[in-house]
Amino acid sequence: MSEEAFIYEAIRTPRGKQKNGSLHEVKPLSLVVGLIDELRKRHPDLDENLISDVILGCVSPVGDQGGDIARAAVLASGMPVTSGGVQLNRFCASGLEAVNTAAQKVRSGWDDLVLAGGVESMSRVPMGSDGGAMGLDPATNYDVMFVPQSIGADLIATIEGFSREDVDAYALRSQQKAAEAWSGGYFAKSVVPVRDQNGLLILDHDEHMRPDTTKEGLAKLKPAFEGLAALGGFDDVALQKYHWVEKINHVHTGGNSSGIVDGAALVMIGSAAAGKLQGLTPRARIVATATSGADPVIMLTGPTPATRKVLDRAGLTVDDIDLFELNEAFASVVLKFQKDLNIPDEKLNVNGGAIAMGHPLGATGAMILGTMVDELERRNARRALITLCIGGGMGVATIIERV
């Protein structure tokens, strides 16, 4: 691959909470179209005929999100019919996978300008609506020793010795960092308010946040997944594989796990030549990407091998990275990643994450990549690494460099 892939723009919607949230009446297609419209406002001279493809991650591609929502967004937004559209699904990392795929297309020289991102309306299309062998088919569950992610998160905490106090302390940090970032205007460049067809404001902030969260309040919450474990026998399945563990300590609650929310994100990826032709200013370049599999029973340990792989591919070390952004699916996932790679607090999830602001499955990867582009610019820093744990036992990681 001889071409470089540059990030020219990275925007997102605010995240609306699932229950009685502000975005529950907004179609996921409308969230994406709104972002395309914003790109037009920011780049009025952009020749959209040069955009060869739109790649969107979406984890539950049924109902409002079915039928290739990326192509629907191209047509509904009035983009040229010559621009393609494809929806992809790598579970929680779908948004980052879309960006990585776009970068690979550009670096191959076969595409010059691609829009990538993701969308998930979890209030309109509940998680699991698309079915699937893993989780719903008893025979497959038996063959692959299926265990829900939440049980895997509690298993990580048990094996690593993370207490309830440890995961709650991390959750409190997430809320505090997110509140600080919002009050400091750190997201102002990338967050695009959602408006109705009359232009009236629907949502302009991440409404899942709880800035008034306290250590004492978190401690009062009951474990969220102990009942699921008992009902489905999932602890027993996990302990068949991890037989040296006597009992799983269920430490995760609604307060130290990622929030269920709605949202979308869009990133413009292109070659240097395309940017020059269109008068676009590159903000960062994609240095390297990597994907890794991991044990599907504990499931959520993939970020560590994916990170080691992408660092090796880029010829870099942990010390060469200024900022790390790991999706906060569950607090124990972040704590283990930090422990594995010896990452200092001041480099990790510096503006909070999904515990505070929510995890709109298909969009999150693109969202947190955009967060890192903004933060590198704000700090005048050089490199960031973005990674997510993934259902089925996988990890994806991407290194970007400010230009």
UniProtKB/Swiss-Prot annotation:
Cross-link Isoglutamyl lysine isopeptide (Lys-Gln) (interchain with Q-Cter in protein Pup) mapped to chain: 189
Tell me where on the tree of life, at the top rank, the source sits: Bacteria
Q: Which GO terms describe its cellular component?
A: peptidoglycan-based cell wall; plasma membrane
Identify the keywords attached in UniProt to this record, alphabetized. Answer: Acyltransferase, Isopeptide bond, Transferase, Ubl conjugation
The answer on whether this UniProt entry bears the keyword DNA-binding reads no
Question: What EC identifiers does the entry list?
Answer: 2.3.1.-
Signal peptide region: none
Give a single Pfam family match. Thiolase_N
Q: What does the record give as the active site?
A: 92, 359, 389
Name the InterPro entries for this protein: Thiolase, Thiolase-like, Thiolase_acyl_enz_int_AS, Thiolase_AS, Thiolase_C, Thiolase_CS, Thiolase_N
The PTM entry states: Pupylated at Lys-189 by the prokaryotic ubiquitin-like protein Pup, which probably leads to its degradation by the proteasome.
GO terms (molecular function) for this protein are: acetyl-CoA C-acetyltransferase activity
Transcription regulation found in the keyword field:
no
Name the PANTHER family for this protein.
ACETYL-COA C-ACYLTRANSFERASE, BLR7806 PROTEIN
Q: Which family does it belong to?
A: Belongs to the thiolase-like superfamily. Thiolase family.
Protein name from the UniProt record = Putative acyltransferase Rv0859
Species of origin reads Mycobacterium tuberculosis (strain ATCC 25618 / H37Rv)
